[in-house]
Amino acid sequence: MTHTQTKGIEISVSSWFRNDLFTEADSNFFYNYEITIRNRLSYPVKLLSREWHVLHLLHGISTISGEGVVGETPTLVPGQEFSYTSGCELIVSMGMMYGKFFFKDLTSEELFYADIPAFSLIYPVLLN
């Protein structure tokens, strides 16, 4: 699990390989990741959007952005956390993801971002 904290927003990430979706003939690699976002600030914030950078080892970086996460734009009051699980498909056996969540301070209306820490996506056979 990896963690980071930016401007009072703490983000934790864990990831795992989806062996149940893998076939050697298909040669695509599926991973899930769980994100937990904690509001360590003294005021409420709303998650507006996300920006992901997905590194496919030896094949470059793709960027994915969009509104909210898993169809939601959660509001987090001070001390509250929000968790969700999502997935990623790689065209190679190893990669990495990192990015940013964009928030609005619901007290001042100020917009800001929090970094999503980099985390590895590795086909487990490569670790043996």
Task: Describe the predicted segments one by one.
Residues 1-27:
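Low-complexity, acidic Ser/Thr/Pro/Gly-rich terminal tails and inter-domain linkers that flank the onset
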Residues 22-23, 44, 91-95:
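Short glycine/serine/proline-enriched coil/turn segments at secondary-structure junctions
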Residues 28-34, 98:
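Short, solvent-exposed loop/turn segments enriched in Ser/Thr/Gly
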Residues 37-41:
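Asparagine-centered strand-capping/turn motif at beta-strand->loop junctions
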Residues 43-62:
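Short acidic, flexible loop segments centered on an aromatic residue
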Residues 56-59, 72-81, 121-128:
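Short, surface-exposed linear segments at secondary-structure transitions and domain or protein termini
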Residues 62-94:
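Intrinsically disordered, low-complexity Pro/Gly/Ser/Thr-rich segments with frequent PxxP/GP/PP motifs
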Residues 89-128:
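Terminal connector regions
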